[in-house]
């Protein structure tokens, strides 16, 4: 029985992407400039390592669709403080597609004409957004995870990079 179980255990998925994609756009029209940076990773799988321990602390929203008896959910186990079935052991239950595409940076600027100014060489006003959008089906916090080589493809529940919007002014004398 043990040998049969060991044969069933195998590496099914890969944390390494099949391909990566990136796209940069720099556009200047009259006194306006636009810069867009994107990035994507496709074909990698992520193990939601943080979710296994949620059974002992907070409960995810998926607990509402848990197994409650015959004919109910086949994807969420029953709710229990004592896990007699060992439902939190590493398994494919916690693995999902980690493919994503991100709009990392968008910057729109306007360059003011300073030809007749005595002290200023250039003035540029800009609006910038970072980490604006992530397109993914991944249910975790962020499919782009931090971690070392030993944590490749394991989501430890780290907080994702924040979305920020800022306004700036460049002045050259």
Where are these regions (language model features)?
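Single conserved hydrophobic/aromatic residue that forms the stacking wall/gate
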Residues: 1-11
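Residues that define the transmembrane beta-barrel architecture of outer-membrane proteins
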Residues: 17-21, 99-104, 161-165
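Outer-membrane beta-barrel pore domains and translocons
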Residues: 28, 39-41, 128-132, 172
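Strand-connecting loop/turn motifs
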Residues: 29-32, 120-122, 162-164
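Repeated loop/turn-to-beta-strand initiation elements of outer-membrane beta-barrel proteins
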Residues: 31-35, 115-116
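Membrane-embedded beta-strand positions of outer-membrane beta-barrel proteins
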Residues: 36, 125-127, 169
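Extracytoplasmic gating/loop element in the C-terminal half of outer-membrane beta-barrel translocons
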Residues: 41-124, 128-130
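C-terminal beta-signal and terminal closure region of outer-membrane beta-barrel proteins
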Residues: 68, 76, 88, 136-173
């Amino acid at each position: 029985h043990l040998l049969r179980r060991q044969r069933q255990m195998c590496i099914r998925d890969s944390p390494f992407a099949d391909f990566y994609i990136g796209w940069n756009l720099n556009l200047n029209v009259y006194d306006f400039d636009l810069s867009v940076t994107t990035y994507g990773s496709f074909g990698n799988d992520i193990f939601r390592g943080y979710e296994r321990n949620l059974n002992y602390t907070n409960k995810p929203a998926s607990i509402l669709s848990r197994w409650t008896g015959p004919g109910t959910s086949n994807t969420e186990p029953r709710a229990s403080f004592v896990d007699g079935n060992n439902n939190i052991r590493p398994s494919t239950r916690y693995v999902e597609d980690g493919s994503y595409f991100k709009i990392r940076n968008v910057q729109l600027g306007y360059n003011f004409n300073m030809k007749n100014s005595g002290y200023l060489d250039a003035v540029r006003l800009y609006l910038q957004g970072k980490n604006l959008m992530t397109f993914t089906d991944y249910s975790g916090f962020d499919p782009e995870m931090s971690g070392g080589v030993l944590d490749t493809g394991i989501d430890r529940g780290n907080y994702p990079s924040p979305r920020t919007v800022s306004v700036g002014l460049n002045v050259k004398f």
